[in-house]
Amino acid sequence: MPDFRYADALPEVRMSNALTTPNYLLPDLVEIQRESFRWFLEEGLIEELLSFSPITDYTGKMELHFLQDYKLKEPKYSVEEAKRRDSTYSVQMYVSTRLVNKETGEIKEQQVFIGELPLMTDRGTFIINGAERVIVNQIVRSPGVYYKQELDTNGRKTFNASLIPNRGAWLKFETDANDLVWVRIDKTRKLSAVVLLKALGLSDNEILDAFRHPEYFQKTIEKEGNYSEEEALLELYRKLRPGEPPTVSGGQQLLETRFFDPKRYDLGRVGRYKLNKKLRLSVPETTRILTPQDILASIDYLINLEFDIGSPDDIDHLGNRRVRSVGELLQNQVRVGLNRLERIIRERMTVSEAETLTPASLVNPKPLVAAIKEFFGSSQLSQFMDQTNPLAELTHKRRLSALGPGGLTRERAGFAVRDIHPSHYGRICPIETPEGPNAGLIGSLATHARVNSYGFIETPYKVVKDGRLSGEIKYLTADEEDEFRVAAGDVAVDEGGNILANPVTIRYRQEFGLASPAEVDYVAVSPIQIVSVATSLIPFLEHDDANRALMGANMQRQAVPLLRPERPLVGTGLEGQAARDSGMVIVSDIDGAITYVSGEQIRVRGENGQEFAYPLQKYQRSNQDTCLSQRPIVNVGDQVRNGQILADGSATEGGELALGQNILVAFMPWEGYNYEDAILISERLVYDDVFTSIHVEKFEIEARQTKLGPEEITREIPNVGEDSLRNLDERGIVRIGAWMEAGDILVGKVTPKGESDQPPEEKLLRAIFGEKARDVRDNSLRVPNGEKGRVVDVRVFTREQGDELPPGANMVVRVYLAQKRKVQVGDKVAGRHGNKGIISKILPKEDMPYLPDGRPVDIVLNPLGVPSRMNVGQVFETLLGWAGACLNVRFKVTPFDEMYIKEASRYLVHEKLMEAREVTGDPWVYSDTGKHIGKIQVYDGRTGEAFDRPVTVGQIYMMKLVHLVDDKIHARSTGPYSLVTQQPLGGKAQQGGQRFGEMEVWALEAFGAAYTLQELLTVKSDDMTGRNEALNAIVKGKAIPRPGIPESFKVLVRELQSLGLDVSVHKIETQHDGSSRDVEVDLMADVGGRRTPNRPTYENIGGPREMEFSED
């Protein structure tokens, strides 16, 4: 029995059995960020400080200890204030230190400032210089020991083992065709394993006793000779430091520093755990350096592999890859800063007088501050947050990247790393990843996954005992899961929790198989546990091809928040949690009653009488220029509970994600206007603001100090009429609420002009009239081409107010323009199933195809977009949406619903359409007989005639994507040129031209359009003198002169000459007597503009033409 949940006017119907709905609630979706940062503050920072303590000077007289406790001061600015002032939301760190003078026994204790640490906001982001940033989680190879099987040149199996620490030298053991064991330290030359083991001070007996097959290693001892400890150390030194005289102490020191010094070598907690697990050791977790026991056990496992005992490792298995989140990445950065700090402290201890030293004079916060700043400002993993809509924000915080420092690079990453691995099940989404060069390197955390203390991804399972679910939930990592028989989340279960299916499909050791219910160990908690949040918002996901689902998941993140958000008629039940965890909606922290509601804030009185205020965001600009605005959804007097939603954010409605609009669709061709993914829409979507969005843009101008005096922000602008200044106030800054078009002045600014800046006629006037006219140049901030909008905010920053300005600036003015963008031809719209298209025509309502009751459809999609792309989910969604619209209800359909009956989606849609037909009483709503089941006869709006055959009609959820034609359309008449090649720049931002590339040249060559081609490659591009003369000729109405030499050709010649190749151009001149001579042409000559003005033009090139360049 479906349960009805009422929200607003439309009842919600959850379709699917109560046992399999996500009744197991999702975890907090931003937990990965917050938990990691909390760990850093509670443990990570202290751990790093203590690892550097004590710092002693070179003589050993002074010692500086860092103590356990550190303090954080209150942040200087709040989050909102930091955003407004363009500063960083951070706290100051103070740490207790103790300076001990060993000679006098004097002890000084002091709290020392060690730097500023950016604080995470409660939404899991950081505010750096006023911009919200996210630290992306990195997925890297875990430290530990890895065994690999390789074939040598003769095709014989050999094995090797790599011992990878968290930081320090790599150790590689390998066997060869002669059954000898070798070792490499940090990819240097091969060294016999005997040498290393003897250098560690082990005797023959200790070595051979550690092995299961000592006879195998005996060969290496016999072949390589038996070394004493001293000889082994000398040999080791020779191999690692060739060319230096070897000494025993040198060898000893080399070994110590490489593997046994905690400062230089660290396995990390994870490395030690993995090593103990793989080699079955019981070394304590606090021992983070190598022990002889580790090395012996590694070699023993390697030898056992030769006897088919044990197994090689799969490095793409998630048991061997771990996640480094904010906390750990930050900790590594702090270590870098402390390393630099340690050197400075040592030097200061040595240089200064011992009596005058205090901890504060020793510790300089600069290196630590610089390291942290560098990480947040320029690391590949610190990214400008994607704030297009709440889902984009949420997904960005849950992203997993294999790129970045210590990770892979795009070029080196092969196919295996990018591919889906069986261990991704329930941990990394197999669907959501970018298209293009980063495919497979950037992923998204699955809905229920979490990261454990070692950094491995875990996923929850329900425990099964004797074929019955016990209700207990257990999180398993990828390598733990391999040992159990695990059934999928859509297994049929009865009321008592007994598994009904027999046999059950299970996964065991990365293979699919069958088992009886009694053999099953675990069942997945939910069918959507394998996909990410964005993917889980796609209804009928199981009916879509994975490639299209990928596009659907990625495009939801690009949906622009619309003016009036509307929830989907067909959802999946996760919209509420996605909106809540994105942080865009306001959630009550207490139980209580609403005492005040306005557009600015909401106040709640708790049960103890205390009032809490929740301020609302209004028309703020997001990182992507979309609009962030919150609307209250409660009224005064309402009782609210802790966790209830008080206000909607952008792209949410009723506390649920609402990225698009439900619109009436017909799948049919229409006059070729929806050929190749083009889309035909009705005027209604424009006039009723169905797809209208608000965009807020920021414009900024600085008044700087120049050599000739300060720039001034003023209303007094030379050569500008009063009409252009009508929207400026007395300071010369635009007033809030003014409507601005392209070219209007936002902020008036004048710059002092030097003598050299003046044209000669002005100098002449000056000389005659002797008056010093105001020597300033207009440098105002104007609205750029193609932009218009209303001024919603103006902010002025000056030093007097205490704002931090960039060096050299006296004043910064920032103007925010908001514009309403209606949907128009060229905009990109998409559904949730990867069905995307560009709007090709907007038809009047009366011309659109209409239904039997006279309703015109809103959008016409091409039916050919469905079969070959195999995203049939959109058809199910359309039909169920049609039923929902007729019945006035909304549906929540969990994906993967076939556990109780085959083709469950089809039965559900059929059942609901039958119900819709009964409720409306219109037989045409659903025809379930005849040839055209589920299709509706539509009529041509232009003629009123019925179309050839019935078509599929229904409600589909479409989104307008951020690729708006307004931001892309661009034209250039004249504009800037590149300095080197003298060709026009590219791109809208640079006012660039259209690139006429190699293939376009082929096209003109194929048509033999020689003159057009010559013009394109010369005067329209980089023939410098030619283009000026051509412009001159056009202006004066004369014939266009003949093109000269393109600049890029000269650059090519110069480059060849710089390589030492003598490249010159010659032409053959025919004399009057018929003889010819060879003349060298200087291509560079016309740089000085000495080109003869009377050069032949196209029209006066008469007679026998000689293909030659005129001489200058």
Curated annotation (Swiss-Prot):
Catalysed reactions, as listed in the record: RNA(n) + a ribonucleoside 5'-triphosphate = RNA(n+1) + diphosphate
Family listed: Belongs to the RNA polymerase beta chain family.
Keywords on record: DNA-directed RNA polymerase, Nucleotidyltransferase, Transcription, Transferase
One Gene Ontology cellular component: DNA-directed RNA polymerase complex
Enzyme Commission number(s) of this protein: 2.7.7.6
Name of the protein: DNA-directed RNA polymerase subunit beta
InterPro entries per record: DNA-dir_RNA_pol_bsu_ext_1_sf, DNA-dir_RNA_pol_bsu_external_1, DNA-dir_RNA_pol_su2, DNA-dir_RNAP_su2_dom, DNA-dir_RNAP_su2_hyb_sf, RNA_pol_bsu_bac, RNA_pol_bsu_CS, RNA_pol_bsu_protrusion
GO biological process, one term: DNA-templated transcription
Oxidoreductase found in the keyword field: no
Summary of subunit composition and partner proteins: In cyanobacteria the RNAP catalytic core is composed of 2 alpha, 1 beta, 1 beta', 1 gamma and 1 omega subunit. When a sigma factor is associated with the core the holoenzyme is formed, which can initiate transcription.
Transmembrane segment boundaries: none
Entry function: DNA-dependent RNA polymerase catalyzes the transcription of DNA into RNA using the four ribonucleoside triphosphates as substrates.
GO molecular-function terms, A-Z: DNA binding; DNA-directed RNA polymerase activity; ribonucleoside binding
Gene: rpoB
SUPFAM superfamilies with a match to the protein in the record: beta and beta-prime subunits of DNA dependent RNA-polymerase
Spans annotated as Disordered: 1087-1112
Enzyme class: transferase
Highest taxon of the lineage: Bacteria
Pfam families the record matches: RNA_pol_Rpb2_1, RNA_pol_Rpb2_2, RNA_pol_Rpb2_3, RNA_pol_Rpb2_45, RNA_pol_Rpb2_6, RNA_pol_Rpb2_7
